[in-house]
């Protein structure tokens, strides 16, 4: 048996870093935020896909209201909605036409107020998505800005009569060759027929002109580069406050901010973006002290120093928290249980996107991947020691779900959910609590798929019951926002799923698990993913060692990376979590690493009864030390 050691290097490095002034030499120490964040789980809802109340095939606010009892039973503290404002729907709601009005497809402002009030009555907070960096090109601000240089909104956007360099010219030429160029992400500039200038800066799609927060270091040779204190950028910052204040006035409890770290241009040292958000935080604390700002940033050292309460562990992060679940080299002892058909997973099966093969590191061993992630994650968590929290996500609207590729059985998904739900601050993406499937090659709806990146598979309707529309809507299947996939199929693409389903209905194919991927099928099954998720959330609420401000201490040996073992402790109570995502039995000794965290029962010998057991696993105390044994695809949570 190999001896394990707690990884402390990254933690010590982070602690030393936190002893220095915050980024930008800023001495402010922010409060972490409302108390509910400490033990909370945030539930992300893509509103077009949660529940349709009027039979048009698209989810809406009244549909969510009808499911508040379900959400309360799940045990989450807050719901975060993807954009619900009036949109052009070229990019799934992220091309906003009116920040002050709910899109009619979802209902009215009054419907949202009703949702807030009814959610609050059940102890649930409501957070909205704030797209701070751009608008739709159909937004009235942009339409006026196109006309002249001396109007109210003229400098809300970045305009130029020429492109800055040859690269910009080539990018624009390439983009315009695409028949669907309005949904193309190449380059930073878009050609315009506006009376004032020929080009405007875009953030993502061509229909998403960048709002002008100014340049940290404007180039005098580029007249379109205004300083952050110019009238236009100052007016945009005030507009941002106006939007936040408007919805806080309606009872909303917070915002998740899209692209939060990219608003100010040419800001390499992040000085001006930090100043911008510190200004917002000071204003918010003075006027709305119990509200939450959560960022799409991916670097808590910077994000939390800018005043945010929460930063998110982004799927796009290099050391992403799912990489450890795929063994690209296939260990001699049987390899990862998540390897595809005994062979090497494809890029698409690993990540759901047609990324270039040379962007994927297939040489990294499982141990190296796990250590890379532990170093990264420990550094991030330690950087929150005095300010805010770092959130782990099960998935989201931009990336495939945890049920993807060959990770497609209930036990596999429970291992993954156990990992996320025992992290400091989990964000649970709707449908992941029942194991909803991400399939590639789904229909491209409202700009979900672009440049080889597929997002439709993560946006399919919530599956409530059996049937052709899975209880999401009373419409016919062809009217659904996206198709539903309720069977436990081994298929990895939507066309494969349709072929498999025909064979299944003809009695020629069998599912890989019992029941269906629906709430109805799992509600009364004590072994279901849904009830496992509920149990994990309930355990969090009653166990301060699992709360967001408690420590995360990984235990690791690079010669035997699995089982994954880590401690969560608040100094009074300690949990050990051990997870084996592989296809082989694992046994390790952890005596020295857990000795100081044992409770008064530390002298007891024999089997220790875990708080939670997934599959077959044991924790045994012997005269030679503490031994953890886990069968394939299993895990235990032990209170030390």
Mark where each language-model region is.
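Positively charged n-region of N-terminal signal peptides that target proteins for export
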Residues: 1-4
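Acidic/aromatic-lined carbohydrate-recognition and catalytic surfaces
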Residues: 20-238, 249, 256, 260-309, ...
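Loop/helix patches that line or flank the sugar-binding groove of alpha-linked glycan CAZymes
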Residues: 23, 27, 37, 307, ...
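Conserved alpha/beta catalytic core and glycan-binding cleft of carbohydrate-active enzymes
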Residues: 137-178, 277, 281-461, 466-469
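Surface-exposed beta-strand/loop patches in extracellular or lumenal glycoproteins
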Residues: 582-598
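Solvent-exposed beta-strand/loop surfaces of large extracellular or lumenal domains
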Residues: 605-625
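C-terminal beta-strand-rich structural cap/linker in extracellular carbohydrate-active enzymes
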Residues: 621-640
